[in-house]
Curated annotation (Swiss-Prot):
Its EC number is 3.1.26.3. This is Ribonuclease 3. NCBIfam families: RNaseIII (TIGR02191). The keyword Ribosomal protein does not apply. InterPro entries: dsRBD_dom (IPR014720), RNase_III (IPR011907), RNase_III_dom (IPR000999), RNase_III_sf (IPR036389). One of its GO terms (cellular component) is cytoplasm.
Amino acid sequence: MLTYLEQKINYEFKDKTLLLEALTHSSWAHEGKNEKVSNERLEFLGDSVLSLVISEYLYKNRKDLEEGSLSKYRAEIVCEPSLARCARKIELGSFLRMGKGEEISGGRDRDSILADAMEALLAAVYLDGGLEAVRRVILDLFKEIIDEVLKGIIYRDYKTRLQEVVQSMEVGKITYELVEEIGPDHNKTFVTQVKIGDVVLGIGQGKSKKESEQAAAMEALSKLGILK
């Protein structure tokens, strides 16, 4: 099964334990498995590796852009929705090791979990094969997103888009519900779910309520097949 994932990213691991670590959600150990490993440390590294590769690509290929524009484009390319989109492209959720509770709650298709796992996977490639190897993987997986961002065609107002889709389906009214606030006051993460009636369409998180609502709407659009 892991071989199939390696084929998806066009990279074969020399150290399979790195790949397994990248695929292990923290809930796996929390539910009594005899393993303390999770992908959280790799996720930390992968965030920086991805940022470096995309920064380098933009710097070398868009000499017309000033620092502010470079930062803006990079943020669009490496954001959670983009990472989750790449994860779905390679069916990453189906390979994750996670606790039953997390799986039952829809963890395999949750943007935040997919994005974190994607960063962990990139870090694993970096540690296993070096910068050139992970550069190839990133630029291949993110090619469509990079092109769309640079052409200005990425649709980032997901709430408006979801509203349009739901209205056309005539299935009811959308509501957004703040379900959790994580962390201290100076560094809060907000978790929001978007619903039609009692049916949860998507869950998202962000550093503001608005950002978490956009993330929830984006996940809903992905599940509805509007975003791929």
